Structure formats: C-alpha cells, structure tokens
Amino acid sequence: MNESQISYDASNLSTNNKKNNNIRKKFKLSLYQLQKLALLGAGSSGEVYLVQDTQSKIKLAQKTVRYTEDEKTKNQLETEVKLSTLLKHENIIRIYATYFLKGKINFVMEYMDRGTLADLLKKIKKIPEKYVGLITYQVVKGMAYCQKEKRIIHRDLKPSNILVNSKGEIKIADFGVSTIVEGSWAQKKTMIGTYIYMAPERIDADIYYINCDVWSLGIIVMECILGFYPYIIYNNNELPNSVWIVHELIENNPVPQLDKNIYSQELIDFTNQCLIKDVKKRPTAAILMNHPFIQKYSNLSCDDLAIWLKTIN
C-alpha cells in the first residue's frame, strides 16, 4: 500500500450534507485530502486530531502514535490494528483505516464530538441515574458483543476509553491492550491496564476470566453515580497511588454500597453484581443484558441522552 493512499469502508459514515448521501461504500482516500482542523488531545505517545475529508466534508478523528522499537508499545499497536478489522458494532468505535507514515502509525476513525465519559465527569462531577442507565446499556451491549461473539477482553475499560457524541451514542474505544481468548480465561503474563479499574483477579491471580471487564464497568458506574472513585472511602478519601494499595482496599474491605434511600434497587443490585469479588460468581456482559437495570433503559432511545447532553456546556 502506498504511504499516501488508503482505502476504507465509509458505508456507515454520517453526514449532514445532502450531497454526500450517496457516498460509495468503498472509495480511495488520499491522505492529502485529510485536512487537520483541531488538536483534540495529546499524550506521551501521540496526538488525536479532528480532521475533515475535503471531498466529502466528513469529519473524522485521526489518532497518531509514534512508532517505537519498545516491545510493549509495538504489541499494543499491532493488537489495535488487528482488532480494527474484527470489531464492527454500533457501540464500538469504528476504525476506518490504519496507515504508517513518517515513523508514525495513524488510525482514522469516527469522530465522537462530545469527547469521553471522563470529560463529561470533569464537567458535571456526577450523572443522574437515568442517564447513567442509558450510558451503561450501550456499554454493556458493546461488551457483550466483544465477549460473546469475538472472545475479546478489553483489559483497560475506563471512563477515558468510553466515547460520547451529541446524538447520545456511546462507544467503547482503545483496544490496544486487549486480548483474544479461546475459552473463557486468559493467562496473566503482564499486569496491563489502569490499576484502579482492574478486577482483583487481574492483580493477584495467574489467570483471569472474560468477565474481568465487568468489574471495571461496576467501578465506572459507581464513579458516574457518586462523582468519585468508590474505594476512596476506605483510603482517607484519596485516590490509591499503587496497584497494591488497590488490591488491599478490595481484599480488606466490603464492596462500596450505594444508598438505598437515594438510588433504585435495580441500580444497587447491578453494581453489586458487577463487583462480586469471586470471578466465578460474577456475571458476564451477556448475562447483564438481562438485568433489570439494563432492561429498564433498553427501550429508550439515544435521543433521550442527546437531549440531556445539550444542557451541558
């Protein structure tokens, strides 16, 4: 493949321009047609830009990662490239193209104009239960697809890897540290991911199961509801600064509980199910799809979330 030319599937790209309604499903896109509009974010390994295809006027996100000989980084990049061809679901961020140019790996993907769930939490601290339900329903759908159909463990599910757009759509992103399992478990070779969201078996066991992401989801839901990381109540209201402190907090304390006088029994039971310490008793995402808390919001549309998002600057 020529470095300046890529091919990707544009069949489900959205556009407000009526002239673009008949965009061909497959087309060639010159990299020189991608115009950078803004820097969306930057980290130690690269940047994310808002770009626009100058022909179709479609806005996309372009993640640029500096290529390195570091084995860990190479493995993550290779995993993300591989999974970009496997994952096609309405609640998984769609990567339309990957290419290598001037020492950098680039991912061209759909643009989520409301940023991440972490961005949302920074603005409003905590989210009303109804909207947590609408968000969680979509995340669980994406997780169930990954676990049941693709046998994929994300391994780094957290608010900054859950993306939001103004249409009320929620999508899981960043599968760089994910793994594919043949059965229901994987052998731990390295401790990878963000430790405050890690399931206890990810920290101290030689193997972990496909439902380890469910623990991460439980922590995320609690954080959205409470406005803070739930286990800080056992740590002098401070965020733990090491994986071993997280492990001690989980092992030596009961699972944090939501106030039954404030929150619904469905939500309380949902978080309790997600945060079962015994991995063999913790449900999978597919089982959670039938939980009353998820079913409660399954008939509502993304529009309900979109209307609420309009109230947040």
Residue ranges of model-derived segments:
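AlphaC helix of the protein kinase catalytic domain
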Residues: 118-127
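Conserved short submotifs of the Hanks-type protein kinase catalytic core
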Residues: 103-116
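Activation-segment/catalytic-loop signature of the eukaryotic protein kinase fold
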Residues: 98
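Activation segment signature within eukaryotic-like protein kinase domains
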Residues: 135-136
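Conserved N-lobe beta3->alphaC-helix segment of eukaryotic protein kinase catalytic domains
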Residues: 59, 64-87
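Conserved N-lobe ATP-binding subsite of Hanks-type protein kinase domains
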Residues: 47
